[in-house]
Amino acid sequence: MAITRLNAFHANPGRGAALRRFLASVITDVRAAPGCRSCELYEALDDPEHFAVVEVWETVEAHKAAGKAIAPARLEEAMTLLASPAVGTYFRHVGGADA
């Protein structure tokens, strides 16, 4: 069964556009990772400095392996854009048409 990872990001004041560009560039790499079914970027309707990334993976392990493949310099770049650490949680599908 696939898993879904929900991630929340808050940009430093005035850095929302830069964080959006950064996340969009990372998503391109994530989508190409083994085990990734989908990866989408969302911006909050009421806050252009608040983003969510919704990822669907074959397994938690596939997600973790993809994360390890991100270059440390890219992670350091992200830290300069974030107001607080990103928050991510794994979910499993438990209801709806495909349950």
Question: Which residues does each PLM region occupy?
Answer:
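Short, surface-exposed ligand-recognition loops at beta-strand->loop->(often short) alpha-helix junctions
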Residues: H10-A18
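Short acidic, gly/pro-rich beta-turn/loop elements at beta-sheet edges
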Residues: A17-R21, E49-F51, H63-A65, D98-A99
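Short, flexible segments with low predicted structural confidence
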Residues: M1-I3, A18, P34-C36
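Glycine-rich beta-strand-turn "strand-cap" elements at beta-sheet edges
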Residues: A2-I3, E40-E49, E76-A99
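An amphipathic, aromatic/His-enriched active-site/gating alpha helix that lines ligand/cofactor pockets
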Residues: R21, S25-S38, V56-Y90
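Short, well-ordered beta-strand segments in beta-rich or mixed alpha/beta enzyme
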Residues: A2-H10, E40-G67
